[in-house]
Amino acid sequence: MHATGLAAPAGTPRLRKWPSKRRVPVSQPGMADPHQFFDDTSSAPSRGYGGQPSPGSLGYPTSSSEAAFLAAPMSNMAMAYGSSLAAQGKELVDKNIDRFIPVSKLKYYFAVDTVYVGKKLGLLVFPYLHQDWEVQYQQDTPVAPRFDINAPDLYIPAMAFITYILVAGLALGTQDRMIGGVLTGLLFGKIGYYLVLAWCCVSIFVFMIRTLRLKILAQAAAEGVPVRGARNQLRMYLTMAVAAAQPVLMYWLTFHLVR
């Protein structure tokens, strides 16, 4: 007896159940989980439709490059403006000072160097062997003192005055009082003082006569005045009077230091 009902008829093939091939969605870095309520912002910023691309990725300059680009012209402009203000201020100061003190002319008398100062001091102390006393000119303008030992200068007189004050103050300070002191007398007494004073007086007299005499003669020749004219003779007498007054001034400034 054949079973009926669930039995399959003869000749009919049986169906086999294969496992389900449904693909499980894999979460990608750029896609959000459908079961997640909020986006995960802890990872790198997304570049999808909602993300904004960075300016540098599109070829536009970033904020740092823009600052560097703008800083260079601004600094150059500020530097140029400051330099122009400094130049204008210097020019204004020079104009105001030149009204009272000819600074441009005074610069000539201070254009000296160490070699010139050494040679000029030697000439002041030993003027007897010097032969050429003429001042050198270049295009009708006297050369700077550092190029000509005969050129006049104000550096040595200024430094001599400052040195006198310093040495006199030192000598007075050794006496523990500000009246009465000694300079040369500290070492050699009055005899040494008078010997040095006599030598300096004669040297400065010879130096001034030889230097100023040529200056007066050159000026007289330029003006067309006769050398033995009354005006030129008056200049020579005044020069000799100024030279003769130097020893008197030297003694008056130093005699109280050897009392």
From Swiss-Prot:
<dbReference type="GO" id="GO:0005783">
    <property type="term" value="C:endoplasmic reticulum"/>
</dbReference>
<comment type="subunit">
    <text>Interacts with HTR1A (via C-terminus). Interacts with ABCB9 (via TMD0); this interaction allows (but is not essential) the ER-to-Golgi trafficking and strongly depends on a salt bridge within TMD0.</text>
</comment>
<keyword id="KW-0333">Golgi apparatus</keyword>
<feature type="topological domain" description="Extracellular">
    <location>
        <begin position="175"/>
        <end position="186"/>
    </location>
</feature>
<keyword id="KW-0256">Endoplasmic reticulum</keyword>
<feature type="transmembrane region" description="Helical">
    <location>
        <begin position="154"/>
        <end position="174"/>
    </location>
</feature>
<feature type="region of interest" description="Disordered">
    <location>
        <begin position="1"/>
        <end position="61"/>
    </location>
</feature>
<dbReference type="GO" id="GO:0120316">
    <property type="term" value="P:sperm flagellum assembly"/>
</dbReference>
<dbReference type="GO" id="GO:0015031">
    <property type="term" value="P:protein transport"/>
</dbReference>
<feature type="compositionally biased region" description="Basic residues">
    <location>
        <begin position="14"/>
        <end position="24"/>
    </location>
</feature>
<dbReference type="GO" id="GO:0000139">
    <property type="term" value="C:Golgi membrane"/>
</dbReference>
<dbReference type="GO" id="GO:0006888">
    <property type="term" value="P:endoplasmic reticulum to Golgi vesicle-mediated transport"/>
</dbReference>
<feature type="modified residue" description="N-acetylmethionine">
    <location>
        <position position="1"/>
    </location>
</feature>
<keyword id="KW-0007">Acetylation</keyword>
<feature type="modified residue" description="Phosphoserine">
    <location>
        <position position="64"/>
    </location>
</feature>
<dbReference type="GO" id="GO:0033116">
    <property type="term" value="C:endoplasmic reticulum-Golgi intermediate compartment membrane"/>
</dbReference>
<keyword id="KW-0812">Transmembrane</keyword>
<dbReference type="GO" id="GO:0005794">
    <property type="term" value="C:Golgi apparatus"/>
</dbReference>
<feature type="topological domain" description="Extracellular">
    <location>
        <position position="259"/>
    </location>
</feature>
<feature type="modified residue" description="Phosphothreonine">
    <location>
        <position position="12"/>
    </location>
</feature>
<keyword id="KW-0597">Phosphoprotein</keyword>
<feature type="transmembrane region" description="Helical">
    <location>
        <begin position="187"/>
        <end position="207"/>
    </location>
</feature>
<protein>
    <recommendedName>
        <fullName>Protein YIF1B</fullName>
    </recommendedName>
</protein>
<keyword id="KW-0813">Transport</keyword>
<dbReference type="Pfam" id="PF03878">
    <property type="entry name" value="YIF1"/>
</dbReference>
<comment type="similarity">
    <text>Belongs to the YIF1 family.</text>
</comment>
<dbReference type="GO" id="GO:0006612">
    <property type="term" value="P:protein targeting to membrane"/>
</dbReference>
<dbReference type="GO" id="GO:0060271">
    <property type="term" value="P:cilium assembly"/>
</dbReference>
<keyword id="KW-0472">Membrane</keyword>
<feature type="topological domain" description="Cytoplasmic">
    <location>
        <begin position="9"/>
        <end position="153"/>
    </location>
</feature>
<keyword id="KW-1133">Transmembrane helix</keyword>
<comment type="function">
    <text>Functions in endoplasmic reticulum to Golgi vesicle-mediated transport and regulates the proper organization of the endoplasmic reticulum and the Golgi. Plays a key role in targeting to neuronal dendrites receptors such as HTR1A. Plays also a role in primary cilium and sperm flagellum assembly probably through protein transport to these compartments.</text>
</comment>
<dbReference type="InterPro" id="IPR005578">
    <property type="entry name" value="Yif1_fam"/>
</dbReference>
<dbReference type="GO" id="GO:0030134">
    <property type="term" value="C:COPII-coated ER to Golgi transport vesicle"/>
</dbReference>
<keyword id="KW-0653">Protein transport</keyword>
<dbReference type="GO" id="GO:0005789">
    <property type="term" value="C:endoplasmic reticulum membrane"/>
</dbReference>
<feature type="topological domain" description="Cytoplasmic">
    <location>
        <begin position="208"/>
        <end position="237"/>
    </location>
</feature>
<feature type="transmembrane region" description="Helical">
    <location>
        <begin position="238"/>
        <end position="258"/>
    </location>
</feature>
<dbReference type="GO" id="GO:0005793">
    <property type="term" value="C:endoplasmic reticulum-Golgi intermediate compartment"/>
</dbReference>
